[in-house]
């Protein structure tokens, strides 16, 4: 760990927030028979963020926060175009990344977090491929995101573009948090 916040171990308790937000999503999806929705980047990242905060693992806090932040515009677009807004999603997409940013700024992050962020992204893509149906296209693990489908010749080019964009975003975010 590169630093500690003056409040010390009390900050670990803030890890309860993202875990609570994940639990609310479980409550939302599981009874409706939509448990696969829990595998989305944002939902898994909330759970992992909470655990990372408990452990005060600044690199893991950064990685999950980066995924939550980069997904924010996509979530806003989906809500605006497709509807389906749920109040719990504000907690996931706004409160958790704000908490993560605050902690990253105060704890610091390692220099390898951009590449680790890509590794996490790939792990969540693989989880979606193994645990969910191609029809759901969770984490766009099976097909190009429909609104941009015409911009990419195939899924693999799209996936590489996503990873490149995420890497650049993680580099810029890391520098901004210094």
Q: What are the language-model segments listed below?
A:
Residues 44-54, 94-106, 157-175:
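Hydrophobic cores of alpha-helical transmembrane segments in multi-pass inner/ER membrane proteins
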């Amino acid at each position: 760990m590169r630093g500690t916040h003056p409040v010390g171990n009390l900050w670990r308790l803030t890890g309860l927030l993202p875990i609570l937000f994940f639990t609310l999503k479980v409550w939302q999806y599981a009874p409706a028979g939509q448990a696969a929705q829990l595998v989305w980047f944002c939902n898994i990242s909330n759970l992992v963020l909470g655990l990372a905060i408990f452990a005060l693992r600044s690199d893991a806090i950064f990685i999950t926060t980066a995924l939550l932040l980069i997904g924010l515009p996509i979530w806003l677009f989906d809500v605006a175009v497709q509807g389906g807004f749920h109040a719990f999603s504000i907690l996931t997409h706004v409160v958790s990344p704000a908490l993560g940013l605050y902690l990253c700024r105060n704890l610091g992050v390692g220099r390898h977090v951009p590449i680790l962020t890509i590794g996490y992204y790939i792990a969540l893509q693989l989880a979606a491929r193994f645990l969910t149906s191609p029809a759901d296209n969770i984490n766009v693990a099976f097909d190009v995101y429909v609104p941009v489908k015409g911009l990419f010749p195939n899924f693999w080019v799209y996936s590489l573009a996503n990873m490149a964009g995420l890497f650049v975003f993680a580099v810029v975010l890391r520098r901004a948090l210094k």
